[in-house]
């Protein structure tokens, strides 16, 4: 297998260990020490990806975490990793990777047609293009979602294991480059406990990618010496292959350490990734800097790379990315890349936007025979699958002149300056400050116990960076309580004279940007200079708004390469300075972190307990589909013979209305209330009076918060003179108990009353329907179930199927119903006895969905669905349960001007003109003659709170809250839908079925 672009010697790879890998179905070879990116380049593979929006051919741009293009799907099945950067993937035997965002293949991507449609797809096109006709939006959405995204999410469970650990140290150094090593060495030799974090497999940082000398020896020897000394010290921990991705308060830094990603899948054992939470007395950020690309025409072609990345591939991996190179720069650093290429036998031409430079590197390049074109810029690159030539024009005083010539080439190495990596500094609370001389943002005053060193602090010269890093390390150790007897001696590094950088944010004029070839700022998201200029013309002035409008800085690289260029172009368009324009927010995570890292080993059910009723297993055995209600697993519906939700609910509803059904209501909250002041407490908590409630009777109550808004509801039964049992909503049980305890403990500590949650003590079954009395009579002989002996809203003690029971005659469906409460350990036996007793009536177990339909047919509310914390009892039309002669919590708030004003949203029913159309819950309601505007706010009357199809009524029904709704009975309103359709409905009473309430009193 030929690696045609692999140099014969050099690089930090092990040529004795060849490795075979597969990319897009083709087999290639690399060496141990390669990354996937370097191995692909060694094999002459430059076209590796398609861009996000236009699906343009893309190649490898960088050699580090900032890579925007070479994003791949790594491995398959349980080990697959989407959106992995090829520049960070260490090569291993048998590695399998595929390009993302290309269908069916990279070369024959069907979405490549977007390149021809690009003029119709500028920034924000999706806000403008798919607005009409509105009923086509579902079709648009389907296609947009099909085209969106990069990699594919895993479809099977992750096979790897993840762990967490915690550490404390005196000094945490982030970055294992020259400055990080120097700072860690100074702190460690002073006796401080040091943790050094670096994201590479080996320490050295930028020194691995250049020919620098330290102490008159190759810089790598100095790296090896310092690393060896650090590893000998007992209080030093070195975390390689580790990324510090978050900096929180009080010097808490989160780090993910990759332990097995560099190994073949078949050989991985133990933990894949380890999440470190490190608390440090002092933090030193030696995070380096990102080289900036230059914004010129077709700068996204494969073969257009950063100059520093080219040097990295040469020195670190022994790869020559091109043999006929154009180095395009505005600074001296790129001349080192020109020298590196020349030393490898490549033909090199430097295009320098500056008129001249008196630096040492340009002089050295000229001595080596490198052609230098000063006062010139690359205006555009050409090529199909790889760059083949560039156009060069003159450049002077910030203006691009006429075309000078075309240069054939197979590589463009660009360098537009350097941007310190400020992400962690900004996350710590620090603010970045613009430096005109260095044309970059630098860290400002530290907010936490932190210092930035090296390129992260804008110190791009090696000699000065090392000296300052040693000082920072010693100062950090001293601040942590350690003072070295002798500071490490600063190594000797030859000072290099550098010419001044000349900022170059955009080649060509802003006016010409929309007309020429695309000049990309953000490679991954296809954000061109013209998009930013368009956003500015359309009124977007905040850089945060421009980011969201254009998608600049989105994606896996989060703007590491392009954001500074984009901010500068925006600043020019707005006539502002870059500091005035500002930066976008540096949010964690610095690089993508796997979900597994955060989850650790806790990949199963949450610690929050799953609550199951006493008959849960019966439900499972009989095929129930479940939904989560609070912490409870409740049967949602019981499908038979392949029924879907709608068919099952229709059958269950009709069974209850025409015969008998049974519901497991054990999840309802139950609070046992006992004591001489029990009635007093209930009077305070509920809006209605409780003094005269007889033993053996039940009463419905509404509970309000201090603002007079409905907080919870339920039925409370009086078991004895000083003994009550309160029921609450399933999801509100804990909240209500806490509410009661809060008032008892803080405001009424002298009340003689005790509360106990007994929800789990009782199994509760609602036997519902016109045949329900006949069912319960068969299993309970010691209770007279006649209407006179056992009236509605009453309670009786008895024995049901051999178990002591509390039976209540209450109904949440409007049908004759009995609620049977038995000790939980007898629950299944009693349930099965009830099922057997009801067999002759075809008794039907039903779930929460049917319960919702039945109660909606009767207009009964569900707190939290038909209320939202802004609804009073009067809004619900339930003023009848609000006492006028007693006080209760929230009463005073009911008389406030806002809660008693006209035009509040009130609880009503809705009947659609199209009887078969079920309104979406949450849909907004507008007046019939109101037109929806795409630009102006539309006045809303209210919204739909509950909506179902009623099998007994054979039509749709809905509950809603509408402004002044109780005075608008019979009026028509409109519900506009997302697809543009307008549904007309009439406001009605919320009681749709059995409006006289006779069915719950059936003989």
What kind of feature is each model-predicted range?
Residues 197, 289, 540, 650-666, ...:
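Residues forming anionic-ligand binding surfaces in small-molecule and nucleic-acid pockets
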Residues 565, 573-704, 709:
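Acidic, proline/glycine-enriched N-terminal capping motif
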Residues 692-743:
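Well-ordered mid-protein domain cores that form the structural environment of catalytic cofactors
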